[in-house]
Amino acid sequence: MESDLEFSNIVSVLKLVEATTQRTVMAKALSSLLAKTPPQVIDKVIYFLLGSLRPDWEGVELGLAERLTLRAISMATGLPIRQVEELYKKLGDAGEVAKRAAEIKRSKGGGGTIFDFIDTGPKRRLTISKVYDTLMAIAKASGEGAQDTKVKLLSSLLTDAEPDEAKYITRFVIGRLRLGVADMTILDALSDAFDVNRDLLEKAYHVYPDLGKIAKTLAEGGEEAVKAIKVTPGVPIQPMLAERLSSPKEILNKLGGVAICEFKYDGERMQIHKLKDGTVKIFSRRMEDITNQYPDVAEYAREAIDAEEFIVEGEGVAIDPDTGEFKPFQELMHRKRKHNIKEAIEEYPINLYLFDVMYVNGQDLTDLPLPDRKKVLFSIIKPHEHVHHADWIITDDADSLEKFFLDAISSGCEGVMCKSVKLGSVYEMGARGWLWIKYKRDYKSELSDTMDLVVVGAFWGRGKRAGTYGALLLAAYDPDSDQFYTVCKVGSGFTDEDLKKLPQMLEPYKIPHRHPRVVSKMEPDIWFTPGLVLEITGAEITMSPLHTCCSVMLKGDVGLAIRFPRFTGRYRTDKRPEDATTVKEIFEMYSNQKKVKLTDQVP
């Protein structure tokens, strides 16, 4: 047992995490669990806690729908499928159904399944290896009869499980573990459990975002082994992020007087990798493998980039085939389909606009200044109809920057991205800093920019909205505390179609109480694990006693809130909750807003 861990240890922690609203309690429980986990299986423990068999970018899916999961519960417990389905209607949670069915089986001294009539000796306690390996076998089952194989494998696992174990295994299978244990929380727990510098772990995570691998490397090889983790083609790196300002003069001052400025296209950010064997992979901003959605872009990159191995970054933009004009981001949603991709390619063609290079032919370029990376990028791009360098200028003049910005807007772009050219202008993986600054005005709103906020709660509607959500509680992210602070309650901007699909979209995130990473004074009717990100605009940012955003910075019992918030119609499925607008950004927007008001009052 020394090289394995009884699954009951994990279940004890899961129960505690699910019940608590205190982040410190959750962190301590996770740290204690990882400290006693054998190195051989620490990766499996972490994957289970995160609700995924492998990192998201590997795209491993179990492929078991809820209906088939209920069948497996029926097989494992001997309860008729009709009774299991009735339990599901009553409880509304397949995990609770599995637990209740196991309890019924136990109370009857066995459920009459085939496993009850075979003398297998004393019942063996489940280990994480048994659970994980069986789940991986379910994911790998393919071909004729795969669904039956998956159901039988899950059934055999549930047969060996205690009621609470069955509950969490089932929730894992249907993708509703509902713990909200985030990557940053795991990094905190690893740092505490192994008494190592958290920054070291986070740096490795930015280079190689696989917490299972990082944990196993740390447990088996120590800090030096973690330091040896390098940028690897085929493994996405955490994208660099930008701050925001709303005037050319401020931007140039912040960047030291001169900047490279590029069009900020209204498309999908893409990190494109080519491996030595010729394989091309495309990763989204969320580091998910989206190659299958964009096989044309993969081929364009293979043709246009003159390097055996590379990692480049750019924006995939929908193009009108008749006029060559840019089309809005929403057009790319048609590329999300799993079928008829050929038709989608013809109907919604794409151009690729490259703006950075991070790796070429065995060389990690992330520590080079931006001008040096640009030289490399220009040297490897061959002329191609569908692949171009992003439109750009280098300037030290605010008027020139403003003119370039207006050119970008008139071309259908969101604005411009301004970047430092100084010696320290490295590619900061996973960091949001002042080396890159967004200049992006929303002319339809009094706010200088939109915000991407995370849904953490919902309020039931009244009147026409009775029976669905009337408003959502939204929060901004604080990377320093790894918590979400509420900033508005939004009910405007939603179409009838939005109101119809939101409950379904949010169902996987529903939890019985406030999540420990959410800081809120308001009490919505329904709480959610931070997950879904929405784009929001509004009139202005004001002080509010009802919200917690920036309350630490304001040093009082008030926070900041968005006045007259409105949903823009854009679901930011390309962003993780940790990629949402930060509390620091909102505070800066509030400060800039006050400066503008003061300026307007000057005669």
Curated annotation (Swiss-Prot):
Binding site for ATP: E262, R269, R285, E315, F355, R432, K438
Catalytic residues (positions): K264
UniProt-listed InterPro entries: ATP-dep_DNA_ligase, DNA_ligae_ATP-dep_bac/arc, DNA_ligase_ATP-dep, DNA_ligase_ATP-dep_C, DNA_ligase_ATP-dep_cent, DNA_ligase_ATP-dep_CS, DNA_ligase_ATP-dep_N, DNA_ligase_N_sf
Any one Gene Ontology molecular-function term assigned to this protein's record: ATP binding
Catalysed reactions, as listed in the record: ATP + (deoxyribonucleotide)n-3'-hydroxyl + 5'-phospho-(deoxyribonucleotide)m = (deoxyribonucleotide)n+m + AMP + diphosphate
Disulfide bonds: none
Any GO BP: cell division
Cofactor: Mg(2+)
Functional description taken from the UniProt entry: DNA ligase that seals nicks in double-stranded DNA during DNA replication, DNA recombination and DNA repair.
Family: Belongs to the ATP-dependent DNA ligase family.
Name of the protein in question: DNA ligase
Source organism phylogeny: Archaea, Thermoproteota, Thermoprotei, Thermoproteales, Thermoproteaceae
